[in-house]
UniProtKB/Swiss-Prot annotation:
GO CC terms, sorted: host cell cytoplasm
One MF annotation (Gene Ontology) recorded for this entry: nucleotide binding
UniProt-annotated stretches for the region Disordered: 1-67, 83-106
UniProt keyword annotations, A-Z: Glycoprotein, Host cytoplasm, Nucleotide-binding, RNA-binding
InterPro entries hit by this protein: Rotavirus_A/C_NSP5 (IPR002512), Rotavirus_B_NSP5 (IPR020244)
Subcellular location: Host cytoplasm
Pfam families: GBR_NSP5 (PF17580)
Biological processes per GO annotation: viral genome replication
Family affiliation: Belongs to the rotavirus NSP5 family.
Name under which the protein is recorded: Non-structural protein 5
Function in brief: Plays an essential role in the viral genome replication. Participates, together with NSP2, in the formation of viral factories (viroplasms) which are large inclusions in the host cytoplasm where replication intermediates are assembled and viral RNA replication takes place. Orchestrates the recruitment of viroplasmic proteins such as capsid proteins to these factories.
The protein's assembly and partners: Homodimer. Interacts with VP1. Interacts with VP2. Interacts with NSP2 and NSP6.
Length: 170
């Protein structure tokens, strides 16, 4: 009986390995068929890929040829006339260029005057701080400053302060 069970076991193992081999071969055949289908699709789309590449390269060449213009959006869109259908570009006149230049110059002047005024106010503030630092400290101001900072003093500093106040009273 033991020999019979061993024999059956090897037969079952062979059957399993054979079925595994068959499934592997089936999947390989399916993959090969899928690859051939993909190749057919690729060959059909070669023209579209080439045309898209050429379109990209043409667009890139156009971008390289366009001059780089640094304009603000306001100046750029001022020259466009909007209609119901589309944007129509109209050439800007020399008068508008002159007015634009004048407006830009005034704007620059305003910016420079604003920055100058800002710097002046900062300098005035610094001068006031320096004046306050250099003022002679009166006894009342020193006393008030000490009382404000008493909490920050250590115990020994507080004792020394009290001794100094008592000695100054004598």
């Amino acid at each position: 009986m033991a020999e019979a069970s061993e024999f059956n076991f090897t037969i079952k193992r062979k059957q399993r390995t054979m079925s595994d081999r068959r499934t592997r071969e089936d999947t390989k055949q399916k993959k090969i068929e899928e690859k051939s289908d993909i190749d057919l699709v690729d060959s059909a789309s070669v023209y579209s890929q080439e045309s898209s590449r050429s379109n990209y390269s043409d667009a890139y060449d156009k971008l390289k040829r366009e001059p780089m213009v640094e304009e603000s959006n306001d100046a750029k869109y001022r020259n466009f006339e909007f209609s119901e259908d589309e944007e129509v570009h109209r050439p800007s006149s020399k008068a508008s260029d002159k007015s634009y230049r004048e407006m830009k110059r005034k704007h620059d002047d305003i910016n420079t005057s604003d920055s100058i005024l800002e710097k002046l106010s900062e300098l005035n503030l610094e001068i006031e701080k320096i004046k306050q630092m250099n003022q002679p400290i009166t006894i009342d101001a020193a006393f008030n400053m000490i009382l404000r900072n008493v909490d920050n003093l250590t115990i020994r500093q507080k004792q020394a302060l009290i001794n100094a106040i008592v000695n100054s009273m004598n």
